[in-house]
Amino acid sequence: MSTHVDRKRITIPQIRSMKGKGSIVSLTAYTTPMAQMMDEFVDLIIVGDSTGMVAYGFNSTMSVTLDMMINHGAAVTRGVSKACVIVDMPFGSFQESPQQAYRNAARVLVETQAQGVKMEGGAELLETVDFLVRRGIPVMPHIGLTPQHANVQGGFKAQIRTEEEINAFIKLGRAFEEAGAFALLVEGAFEEAARKVTAAVTIPTVGIGASPECDGQVLVTEDILGLFSGYTPKFAKRYVDLSQPIKEAFSRYAHEVRSGEFPAMEHCFGVRKNSDGG
């Protein structure tokens, strides 16, 4: 069994200071083993509400609960000794009021030991971000394509196309910076919009389906590992196809159990070895 080693983790101020100094490397994680494996390679781990679709088979993120996010967030921080960890606030846990958002975000930080929260939305969140930051809770607003607003946005479609929309997007990014956000997650925005908002703010932008000009990139880990055999989003890159070796392992295990090959005596307790080592 592995044990967590408490070392110096990357801090929120350090993430903020990485603006313009090389790309911030970020991935999603929902479990301790995955967090342990990626920890040495990434700067920022996002415990995303995408877990609803990745781990639970939901059609969207709307069914994810605060308790689910806390459980996954705590699992991830137990596996991390270097990376900064941010936890998504799920739909319905922060939209009602700044006070509701504070209560739930404070619970997330206390119970998970994560370093900040991520919230999806637009100008309606400005007051909430200011309220939380003033009370010691680091916030990363998630702008552009926001999956929690898929019903309003008409599905998972790229956003911010026109000049008017781009100008409003830049204004929104600056407003979040003024409200105290430490970084912005920019998803599914047209490249020009993502590039221009990155240039317009002094806090880092982390892109997913956005622009190479963002200050960092994040992808869903299961997408880069090829764990979904049927679909890879346009903005994702599959670095390995693990679905096939995993299926092969399942196949070999099933065959050995059915054939009686597994377990062998070497896998059993209380069995003495023969004098010849057999």
Curated annotation (Swiss-Prot):
Keywords: Cytoplasm, Magnesium, Metal-binding, Pantothenate biosynthesis, Transferase. 3-methyl-2-oxobutanoate binds at residues 49-50, 88, 118. Belongs to the PanB family. The active site is at 187 (proton acceptor). It is found in: Cytoplasm. It is an enzyme of class 2 (transferase). This is 3-methyl-2-oxobutanoate hydroxymethyltransferase 1. Pathway: Cofactor biosynthesis; (R)-pantothenate biosynthesis; (R)-pantoate from 3-methyl-2-oxobutanoate: step 1/2. InterPro entries: Pantoate_hydroxy_MeTrfase, Pyrv/PenolPyrv_kinase-like_dom, Pyrv_kinase-like_dom_sf. It comes from the Bacteria. GO terms for molecular function: 3-methyl-2-oxobutanoate hydroxymethyltransferase activity; magnesium ion binding. Homodecamer; pentamer of dimers. It comes from Hahella chejuensis (strain KCTC 2396). It holds the Pfam family Pantoate_transf.
